């Protein structure tokens, strides 16, 4: 199935006769539309009004769906088509709000002047008390330069703000962390590093987000070396954690021993290199990779992986194949070997459709729709903050992946991303790994 990336809500009136909702659903489905939520808005004596959420690929397909619904006749009427995604973003998705009401002069004196001066003097004498008497201990900066926003590319940090707000909302809901978007108007590595270092006293962690390759590698490495708080580039390590979890689950379903398998990575950008490093940290000895960039291949070899010259060679060699190239249809069915596990993770369209891979002989196949970073970063940072860790290392990341895999039902590739139990499990595993490393 092809991933859909336009969502619209159709308000449709149907006569109160059995089968009319089915006719609407059939009309939408025949044109390739995916129906999401169906909400009953009003039930009248002779009709029912419903909001039906539909996902389509593009505007052309949307217009075809609209025309098909309008052509049904027999009392079926399309009233409105609305963009609820855009509506949800009006005014932004997050806000900074006081935890304390200020309703009297006495409360004002405690929250602000003159009382706050005593707290300031205490922190001046004992800086570690800032973790008790300020929000710093629970705040993470979400930093972007806007050079690699989702699948949209270099669109700038302001255009990427909705993504950063989404990350902040997920931090809050899934891990109780205050995520603060920081938009940078530079893509110069030195300026980014300097800026993040200057703002770091106000945070207990740094999440680097949608920063392009190759400068993302230098930025993360330098910040991890020069700061004493956790730093993680989510496009690299968040993706790698969830990919490893998916591979563990897939191998469990396919009866494959992951640590003894040959793992191949197609595409060695930020995510691809991190995935290779994650599998090596997990204990996989044979990790192969291929990319059209010679420097990317060299980078993989510096980390201990093996570069191969072509996709065909990698597919012929490896038991487990992961692809993050962004090129739809790159993996031809003829390349697939019997019994392979294939995770084609590019969105909105994968390198090979799971159905095509399975028909070609793969033992297990999945695409990127279910392999979502949301499963990783909230719990990873919650665990790191709980442990008061100064870093996020590969032991902590492997622990996160194993926790996600342990929460995955048999037959699924990963758990449901909004399941709070999963995020609690990830946080606990990461905290334990961090504290074990300290000992």
Swiss-Prot record:
* PANTHER family, per the entry: NADP-DEPENDENT MALIC ENZYME
Tell me a Gene Ontology molecular-function term this record carries. Answer: metal ion binding
Q: What induces it?
A: Weakly expressed in glucose or malate minimal medium.
Q: Which reaction does it catalyse?
A: (S)-malate + NAD(+) = pyruvate + CO2 + NADH; oxaloacetate + H(+) = pyruvate + CO2
Which residues does the UniProt record annotate as the domain ACT? 9-84
Describe what happens without this gene: Mutant can use either a gluconeogenic carbon source or glucose as efficiently as the wild-type strain. The ATP concentrations in the mutant grown in minimal medium with glucose are similar to the wild-type level. ATP concentrations slightly decrease in malate minimal medium. The mleA-maeA-malS triple mutant shows a decrease in ATP concentrations by about 20% and a moderate growth defect. NADPH overproduction is roughly halved in the deletion mutant.
Keyword Metal-binding attached: yes
Q: Which family does it belong to?
A: Belongs to the malic enzymes family.
Q: How is the cofactor bound?
A: Divalent metal cations.
Q: What is the native source organism of this protein?
A: Bacillus subtilis (strain 168)
* Ligand binding (NAD(+)): 268-271, 347, 373
Keywords linked to the UniProt accession: Magnesium, Manganese, Metal-binding, NAD, Oxidoreductase
Active site per database record = 112, 167
What Enzyme Commission number(s) apply to this enzyme?
A: 1.1.1.38
Highest taxon, organism lineage = Bacteria
Organism placement in taxonomy: Bacteria, Bacillati, Bacillota, Bacilli, Bacillales
Question: Which Pfam families does the record associate with it?
Answer: 2-Hacid_dh_C, malic, Malic_M
What is its biological role?
Answer: Catalyzes the decarboxylation of malate to pyruvate. Is specific for NAD, cannot use NADP. Can also catalyze the decarboxylation of oxaloacetate. Involved in keeping the ATP levels high.
Annotated InterPro entries: ACT_dom, Aminoacid_DH-like_N_sf, D-isomer_DH_NAD-bd, Malate_Decarboxylase, Malic_enzyme_CS, Malic_N_dom, Malic_N_dom_sf, Malic_NAD-bd
Q: Where does a divalent metal cation bind?
A: 209-210, 235
Q: What is this protein called?
A: NAD-dependent malic enzyme 1
Requisite cofactors? Mg(2+); Mn(2+)
């Amino acid at each position: 199935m092809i991933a859909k990336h336009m969502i619209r809500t159709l308000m449709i009136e149907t006569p109160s006769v059995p089968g009319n909702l089915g006719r609407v659903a059939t009309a939408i489905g025949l044109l390739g539309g995916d129906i999401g939520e169906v909400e009953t808005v009003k039930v009248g004596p002779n009709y029912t009004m419903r909001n039906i959420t539909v996902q389509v690929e593009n505007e052309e397909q949307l217009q075809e769906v609209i025309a098909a619904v309008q052509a049904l006749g027999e009392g079926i009427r399309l009233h409105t088509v609305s963009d609820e995604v855009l509506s949800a973003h009006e005014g932004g998705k997050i806000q900074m709000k006081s935890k304390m009401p200020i309703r009297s002069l006495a409360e004002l004196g405690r929250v602000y002047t003159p009382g706050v001066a005593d707290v300031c003097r205490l922190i001046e004498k004992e800086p570690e008390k800032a973790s008790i008497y300020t929000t710093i201990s629970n705040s993470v900066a979400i930093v972007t330069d806007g050079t690699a926003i989702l699948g949209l590319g270099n669109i700038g940090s302001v255009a990427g703000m909705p993504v950063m707000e989404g990350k902040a909302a997920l931090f809050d809901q899934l891990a109780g962390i205050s995520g603060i978007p920081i938009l940078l108007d530079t893509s110069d590595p030195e300026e980014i590093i300097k800026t993040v270092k200057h703002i770091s006293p106000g945070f207990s962690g740094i999440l680097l987000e949608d920063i392009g390759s190759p400068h993302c590698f230098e930025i993360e490495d330098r910040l991890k070396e020069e700061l004493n708080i956790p730093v993680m580039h989510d496009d690299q390590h968040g993706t790698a954690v969830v990919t490893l979890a998916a591979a563990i689950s897939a191998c469990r379903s396919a009866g494959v021993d992951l640590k003894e398998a040959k793992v191949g990575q197609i595409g060695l950008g930020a995510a691809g290199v991190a995935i290779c490093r994650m599998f090596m940290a997990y204990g996989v000895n044979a990790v192969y990779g291929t990319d059209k960039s010679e420097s990317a291949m060299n980078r993989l070899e510096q980390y201990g992986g093996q570069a191969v010259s072509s996709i065909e060679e990698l597919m012929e060699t490896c038991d487990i194949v992961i692809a993050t190239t962004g090129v739809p249809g790159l993996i031809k069915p003829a390349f697939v070997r019997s019994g392979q596990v294939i995770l084609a993770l590019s969105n909105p369209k994968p390198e090979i459709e799971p159905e095509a891979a399975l028909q070609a002989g793969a033992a297990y196949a999945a695409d990127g729709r279910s392999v979502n970073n949301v499963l990783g970063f909230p719990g990873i940072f919650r665990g790191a903050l709980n442990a008061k860790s100064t870093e996020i290392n590969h032991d902590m990341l492997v622990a996160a992946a194993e926790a996600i895999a342990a929460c995955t039902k048999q037959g699924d590739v990963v758990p449901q991303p909004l399941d709070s139990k999963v995020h609690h499990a990830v946080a606990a595993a990461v905290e334990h790994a961090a504290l074990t490393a300290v000992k």
